[in-house]
Amino acid sequence: MDVVASEQIRALKHRYLRTLDLKRWEEFADTLTADVVASYGSPSGDLPPEFHGREAVAEYMRNALSGNIITVHVATHPEIQVDGDTATGSWLLEDTVMIPDYNRVIRGAAYYHDTYRRENGVWRIATTGYQRIFEAVMGTDALPGFTLTANRWAEPAPH
């Protein structure tokens, strides 16, 4: 077992999710190989089954999560298998998406299945996708007492 490579891949997946949630698109793109293939199908969205290439994936995320949309992605239970300069990984994902403009909260869980490639000593995601366990969409008006008290992406309120 290559413990160093496994830890590097674990850090890579966490960086992928952190840069996604913080909308750091250049850093997000840097977690992906140039020829990455990503599948982000969702029952609540009308998404193409796959995106091909680093720029296509980053552009999709940049557009889909623009404005004041809030996301939190947490990946746990990693199962990483390293074979030289390639690896596979499975992760449990729990995610929350808040869409204030539409008074919606999406909550879900899925299992990610990734492949990784080490190029010039740097691990990147070569393929990524997930299979949903569940996804629930709630209107915030149906949540008694729901108040969004902080949103990093909201326009400042006029004084």
Regions found by a protein language model. Name each.
Residues A5, I9, D21, E50, ...:
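Aromatic-acidic/polar surface patches that form glycan- and anion
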Residues I9-L17, G53, R117, W123:
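Short, intrinsically disordered low-complexity segments
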